[in-house]
Amino acid sequence: MALRALHAQPTGGPQLRFLLFLLLLLLLLSWPSQGDALALPEQRRSLSESQLNPDELRGRFQDLLSRLHANQSREDSNSEPTPDPAVRILSPEVRLGSHGRLLLRVNRASLTQGLPEAYRVHRALLLLTPSSRPWDITRPLQRAISLQGPHARALRLRLAPPPDLAVLPSGGARLELHLRSAAGRGRRSAHLHPRDSCPLGPGRCCHLETVQATLEDLGWSDWVLSPRQLQLSMCVGECPHLYRSANTHALIKARLHGLQPDRVPAPCCVPSSYTPVVLMHRTDSGVSLQTYDDLVAQGCHCA
């Protein structure tokens, strides 16, 4: 009688508990161990020589390098190449209008001449004279481009200049246009692409250069065990005006260097990003693996 009553109970409850138990077991079995994920930077993992023989130590070193390269390859594959920004220097027509307004006329075709259609004006700086400070007219110019349409042969702007620029301009007005691809707006490429146009000539402007060096060359042979040879990428070259400026400070520095070269130095070619490198070296307690995040340059800019 009791056996029949037991069989008469619904079986959904025990089956559900059994499925939950299997699910929990699968989660525990698939949970990664502490050594499966590589955290950068990985700080000084000390290994006693008595605990690991050279083969095991070399194996761990190779495993660390493999995971590091896998992370880097995954990052590179997910990043899409961004078209390089471009700079245009134009000579607009500027004259004084009524009520102290400045009337600016710019040839529409000269804005993006020689560039793909995807390029748009990112920044516009007007210099009324060679010694005057730049006047940012980005928004008025972008508004004129939008309102006057793509078929207008010339863009006409009516501007109210700041008080210190409210003078009759000379014929040497310049308009500096910074253009970027619409597909890459808001992103700055960390890599130096070979199609960058250097005004000083090929290979003279800020770029990435790789140099092969041994531990003896670096003076590290007494404490670094591996690798015995390094491919060191570094930033070399000059920084002409408006070339690969890292930020607004670099733009101002380049501008002031042109006006006061004795007081303000030119921007320098420095790394914009780095590639992590793992070194195996000796420590007081044995041998250590350490990741260096600022040893090998990956991209360059002027700052």
UniProtKB/Swiss-Prot annotation:
GO terms for molecular function: cytokine activity; growth factor activity; hormone activity; protein homodimerization activity. Residues 31-188 form a propeptide. Gene3D superfamilies: Cystine-knot cytokines (2.10.90.10). Keywords: Cleavage on pair of basic residues, Cytokine, Disulfide bond, Glycoprotein, Hormone, Secreted, Signal. SMART domains: TGFB. Induction: Expression is up-regulated by obesity. InterPro entries: Cystine-knot_cytokine, TGF-b_C, TGF-beta-rel. It comes from the Eukaryota. Detected in plasma (at protein level). GO terms for cellular component: cytoplasm; extracellular region; extracellular space; nucleus. Glycans are attached at N71. It is found in: Secreted. Hormone produced in response to various stresses to confer information about those stresses to the brain, and trigger an aversive response, characterized by nausea and/or loss of appetite. The aversive response is both required to reduce continuing exposure to those stresses at the time of exposure and to promote avoidance behavior in the future. Acts by binding to its receptor, GFRAL, activating GFRAL-expressing neurons localized in the area postrema and nucleus tractus solitarius of the brainstem. Homodimer; disulfide-linked. Interacts with GFRAL and RET; ligand of GFRAL, which mediates GDF15 internalization and cellular signaling through interaction with RET via the formation of a 2:2:2 ternary complex composed of GDF15, GFRAL and RET. Belongs to the TGF-beta family. This is Growth/differentiation factor 15. The lineage of its organism: Eukaryota, Metazoa, Chordata, Craniata, Vertebrata.
